[in-house]
């Protein structure tokens, strides 16, 4: 069989990875080095050359989008869809496993996935029920604590509190939360992985079945795995499974959410003899950008080591701009984008990256003032929007009456006269009798223990849920969804919310009906009812794609959101000490290297043009703050960077010049471009001027000292 098509389009190192013998393998894949292509071709190689059945292959990705792309590309390469292969995220595959073995995992058949918002809502209720002060014991912190323990594989009884009263309280919250979830048949995202891991540990025959089946395991973005994910893969592989991991220790930027870059080294230790192949040829960026990225990341210690290169052009130098303040910075970026557009470039080819979401406000205002469309990447996702979650909660309750989180969300949405006092009685009964909220309502209504008006409203609500579930059981999913939206008053409620916001909510509900109409079963969903399958899809998918793409628009996003993306022109703003690297990383040991990896990720997003900006002053939290330029700027090779020198007045509050008029010489006798010497900073060049008389100020770019603003009357500069 001719398999040259699997190798012909690859470079030497990519071929080596694709055609490697079936053994444990680490592919250290640099940014833009074609790792997805290598994974896809490797899977095709295993089936075509090694005669491996698709049934024996599990491929793990970190996003549903990446999983869908991998399935599509494998199908294109092989010419047919490959049934039996498991391709998905850790959470998606764990969910599939638990559905198949729900009884062995001690879960009801109709268990539901609890997303982070509903998890928070449940924890608020539990903390209140435990008579804990929400200010002292914040529900969001409880959620972080519980998820962190699960990521480490720990149940409440595993945690050693060592007499620490704070730890003991969190342990009790975790225990109460676990019991509430078990009663209602709810599983949060961290629970999916932990429960799947426990299933294999507690049921050796099930583990053995999957070990014998999945003899070829491939994992993408391995540097982003946490402890439970690593343990999951390690357990599945056993002593006979062949594991290929693809990762880049230089792009490990999720330590704050449990990712362990050390897992790559653990893999090499746990799988002795594993081969390492480095993909260093970059197909994205110019040579200048790659030289800067290499120099930057070399300042980190303990790297596995690789150096990106390209046989493409050197490209333009990296532009560096020192802004007077954040307003100047934003206007500079917008003007550069306008120039790009005037020269025939698309707005969507331009991305503005920032360390913190709070930085976007000024940028958004500048873009609005310039009438320049923009899109915030990673904004509110479709399935996370209020109106969508309301409709989904009704559907969840129809699918499973014991879903407490769904019950809490919709029992009085729209308002139907069921107040907090009534619900508190229901909640207390639920706790006292170890019942779900639905079961507690049933018993209280039978006992006539609730006030008349509230009891009637609750009775009508429950009867409507039961009736609609029965009436729509055999209807198509989209008809069922449309009935829920109309019969429960959601559409009417949002029609009463006047203006664009209400209209947007209605349009989103209509889009949900469209989504249910277009929903198609995956192989792993074939044993589920349509409603259960769609609810699982909605919880796992959570709309990973960005906003509508019909309009050409500038892309705004955090540096974390930018990972995996690429743009012809990239701006990284706020390159200042305390901003990027963040103050937290400077205050906490061990965090600085992850910040540098984040800078590396930002730099390697750029294909053709990269611009870095920093501001001398920045208004933060209502105060004017002075920052030094980021140390990351100083770590870039001088030959790769070019400082931008603009006309004198841009956004200086003390300027007497008309905005935009260039000041070539002022009454202090200095000129733009003049070489000068300062007693402390040495030699430099005047790159900007503002004001006149005693207010005259000069911006001087000093060799090795950066750019400084000086008052001309006191600077005592000597002409060189």
Regions of interest found by a model, annotated:
Residues 53-63, 85, 220, 246, ...:
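Conserved RecA-like ASCE P-loop NTPase motor core of nucleic-acid helicases/translocases
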Residues 2-7, 39, 44, 227-329, ...:
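Conserved RecA-like helicase ATPase core segment
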Residues 1, 240, 562-579, 584-585, ...:
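Structural signature of nuclease core domains in nucleic-acid processing machines
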Residues 21, 82-85, 102-191, 214, ...:
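ATP-hydrolysis module of ASCE/P-loop NTPase motor domains
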Residues 159, 163, 346, 360-372, ...:
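Conserved helicase C-terminal RecA-like lobe
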Residues 3, 7-10, 15-29, 55, ...:
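Inter-lobe coupling/hinge region of RecA-like P-loop helicase motors
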Residues 8-19, 23-28, 38, 58-59, ...:
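Conserved helicase NTPase motor core
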Residues 1-114, 120, 208, 262, ...:
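P-loop NTPase Walker
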